[in-house]
Amino acid sequence: MSDILLGSYKTRLKNLRFITFFVLARSYLSAPYNGMQNRAYAFILITLMIDAIGIGLVFPIMPDLMDRVGASSTGEGALWGGVLMASYAGALFIFAPIIGSLSDAYGRKPVLLMALFILAVDYVVMALATEFWVLLIGRIFAGIAGATYTTATAYIADISSPEKRAARFGMVGAAFGIGFVLGPAIGGIAAELHITAPFWIAAVLSAANVLFGLFVLPESLEPRKRRPFWFSDINPFTAIIGAFKTPGLAIPLICLFVFEFANMVYPVLWAFFTRELFDWSSFTIGISLAGYGILLAGVQGGLMPVFINRVGEFRTLQIGILSALIGFIGFGLISTVTGLILVLIFAALSDLSPPMITAMAANKVDEDKQGLVQGVIASLASIAAFLAPLIMTGVFEVFVDEDGIYLPGAPFLISGVLIALLIPLVWRLRSHAQS
């Protein structure tokens, strides 16, 4: 099984190398700005890709990592892993507006480079950790450093003309996508050498990027355009409450939150679930996650435009919701690798739904509120990413306990129930759709 996956992965990796080269080469050659700004743009893309790699490389090695710090069973390891993931998401949620406001006050470059330096140090700490509390502190600092996404995107806005911003933000998505595919693959393959190898690799990448940034990254925010740091600007709940009071926006936001919460079962439990059912190694887990990432990219970039053109937004949303329901129920009941592969197709198709709901939410507000709505959506996703790991891993631990009912897929069934409860709300979104 591993040999087959490795062969398939090598082919995909060649394609990803080409994509990575194309992304970076385009950032150097095609932007209508001077060479320094082009190199700065490339630096931002690399930074975001490293952030995504850092998130993804932890997933496949999580079971082994929990064993290393003293977890006595797969269930206990999953619970501890859930705490780590929740701590990362919590730090990200709290510090994202703080980091963004600091960059508005003191400039983008110092904030970005300091965060990257913290991330490099954090990876070294994670590599050396033999106690759970050290890993916990490390994940919190990783979440703080990972909050630089807002600063990175602000930097791109600073150096891009209005007509080029959309295309460049699209490249941000491409950089994140490449990172999320490479991260699990690097984690799984490097773990074959040693459980700490992925962290050392990530530390070297982050440190090298800091040095790169020192030389090629100019400050993009002129002193005259900066504004003082105000604590009133860093409360994410103010914007969330305001968004829910906007007519027609509450239902799409509820749907997105529930969908994000249910979908978190995949990154949170995939490694523990496949280890428990099939005794997969970190390598196999990492390659499976990378393959799933490629499958998601195919759905988003290939199938989604086809579905929208053929059946419209609302039908595409329905297909995604139905696929999500089938996927969650399937994962809750499967017992074979063949079944897992079949269900994985439906899980990937479920990714049709969030963009449709997001578009419907965006259609409910004026142009000057689009940034606010997207920020609220990101905040709700962060809240889901904080709550879901704690709940899902707790359920998993209960249902893999030898003294109770053995059902490793129970968290997936819970996600399926949530999606089923969401269906009446989704059907009310028809009036928001543009067919």
Give, region by region, the residue ranges found by the protein language model.
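Cytoplasmic helix-loop-helix junction between adjacent transmembrane helices
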Residues: 138-177
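Short amphipathic helix-loop junctions that connect adjacent transmembrane helices
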Residues: 61-78, 268-285
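A membrane-interface helix-boundary motif in multi-pass transporters
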Residues: 191-204, 394-417
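Conserved MFS/SLC helix-loop-helix module at the cytosolic interface between two early adjacent transmembrane helices
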Residues: 93-130
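Central cavity-lining transmembrane alpha-helices of secondary-active solute carriers
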Residues: 83-99, 290-303
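Multi-pass alpha-helical transporter architecture, strongest
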Residues: 210-216, 413-435
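Juxtamembrane intracellular "pre-TM" segments in multi-pass secondary transporters
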Residues: 218-255
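C-terminal transmembrane helical hairpin of 12-TM major facilitator-type secondary transporters
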Residues: 314-357
